[in-house]
Amino acid sequence: MVRGPRNREKLQGYYDLYMKTGQIDPNVNPEIAASWQKSREVNPPTDRIRTDCRLSPETFAARQKLHRDAMMYLKHLTTGLRDFFKEYDISLLLLDDECVVLKSYSMPFYQMTPGEIEGVRVGLEQIGTSSVSMACELQTPFWVFGPEMWIRESHDSDACSA
């Protein structure tokens, strides 16, 4: 879901209110509000992404092999776009149906290099509300603005979409 520009200070205020009191401001997007509630229930960390939900090297290699065609397609598709990704600080990740990062094709995701993030599960249970968890839940691309994300280190981001 593509959404119009949002006021960062207001979004930060909504997030802070929810984190302190559990109260959701009526101006919070309903899908974001529902995701915040689910995030609070599963209680992922709020400070930064953890990589302890990483697949074993053998399991990860098997998943990559299963999705080899998609990985090769994106590799060829993104070859000419790397400068664009770099200029606009865009991350492009290929995830499987369990939100495991199969391949990182561009800029670091949450300041994590491809070697750090590949093989890591990044679903709602692991990182809370994010563009990834929203797209997975709603089965459609979703635009999430910095202060709406569960992980505080992402609050300075302009926006993320998945």
Predicted regions and their residues:
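Sensory/regulatory domains in signal-transduction proteins
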Residues: 88, 97-98, 102, 115-162
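Intrinsically disordered, low-complexity terminal regulatory regions
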Residues: 1-122
